[in-house]
Curated annotation (Swiss-Prot):
Belongs to the BLOC1S3 family. This is Biogenesis of lysosome-related organelles complex 1 subunit 3. Residues 23-38 have a biased composition (Acidic residues). The modification Phosphoserine is found at residue 64. The keyword Transcription regulation does not apply. It comes from the Eukaryota. It comes from Sus scrofa (Pig). Component of the BLOC-1 complex, a complex that is required for normal biogenesis of lysosome-related organelles (LRO), such as platelet dense granules and melanosomes. In concert with the AP-3 complex, the BLOC-1 complex is required to target membrane protein cargos into vesicles assembled at cell bodies for delivery into neurites and nerve terminals. The BLOC-1 complex, in association with SNARE proteins, is also proposed to be involved in neurite extension. Plays a role in intracellular vesicle trafficking. Component of the biogenesis of lysosome-related organelles complex 1 (BLOC-1) composed of BLOC1S1, BLOC1S2, BLOC1S3, BLOC1S4, BLOC1S5, BLOC1S6, DTNBP1/BLOC1S7 and SNAPIN/BLOC1S8. Octamer composed of one copy each BLOC1S1, BLOC1S2, BLOC1S3, BLOC1S4, BLOC1S5, BLOC1S6, DTNBP1/BLOC1S7 and SNAPIN/BLOC1S8. The BLOC-1 complex associates with the AP-3 protein complex and membrane protein cargos. Interacts directly with BLOC1S2. Interacts with BLOC1S4, BLOC1S5 and BLOC1S6. Residues 1-11 have a biased composition (Basic residues). The modification Phosphothreonine is found at residue 62. One of its GO terms (biological process) is anterograde synaptic vesicle transport.
């Protein structure tokens, strides 16, 4: 046992001071190495120290590592209803509208001026529309009269054309008729011949 601990004792390292870390002495290094050798050594367990036992597999969780599993709420419970009541809330009261602020004299004058302006603008616009409507109606009447005169003139021209066509047909009938005698061959109607000078 002593020979094994002597063979496994690490070599003494030079002491170096590193800022931010604590320096270990040789006594502390030797004590920690001996504890590791006694705990992990091949010899049997010593008195007064816990022995290490290696088991293949995962390490078991301790009591401090166990976490309580969340439990689902039972489904037969009714849904939770939250009722909120505000302090000072009274039921059955009707909210009355706030009274309108009193209008000043300037605001009244402005309202009257605005009403007069609206009335004048509406009257002017309606007058313009009425005059335009009368002018459009007069133009429509004149257009209707001109249309009637044009229709009458077209009817007169159509009648005159019909009369002229009838007269032309009658003249053609008279010119082409053979029932009338030829007045050029009637005896006694021939012109007298001049006998000439006598000797």
């Amino acid at each position: 046992m002593a020979s094994q601990s002597r063979r496994r004792r690490p070599l003494r390292r030079p002491e170096t001071m590193v800022p931010g870390e604590a320096a270990e002495t040789d006594s502390e290094l030797s004590a920690s190495s001996e504890e590791e050798e006694l705990y992990l050594g091949p010899s049997g367990p010593t008195r007064g120290r816990p022995t290490g036992l290696r088991v293949a597999g995962e390490a078991a969780e301790t009591d401090s590592d166990t976490e309580p599993e969340p439990k689902a709420a039972p489904r037969d419970l009714p849904p939770l209803v939250v009722q909120r009541e505000t302090a000072g809330e009274t039921w059955g009261e009707e909210e009355t509208p706030a009274p309108a602020p009193a209008l000043s004299l300037l605001q009244l004058r402005l309202a009257e001026s605005q009403a007069r302006l609206d009335h004048d603008v509406a009257a002017a616009v309606s007058g313009v529309y009425r005059r335009a409507g009368r002018d459009v109606a007069a133009l429509a009447g004149r257009l209707a009269a001109a249309q009637a005169a044009g229709l009458a003139a077209a009817h007169s021209v159509r009648l005159a054309r019909g009369d002229l066509c009838a007269l032309a047909e009658r003249l053609d009938i008279v010119a082409g008729c053979r029932l009338l005698p030829d007045i050029r061959g009637v005896p006694g109607t021939e012109p007298e011949q001049d006998p000439g000078p006598r000797a």
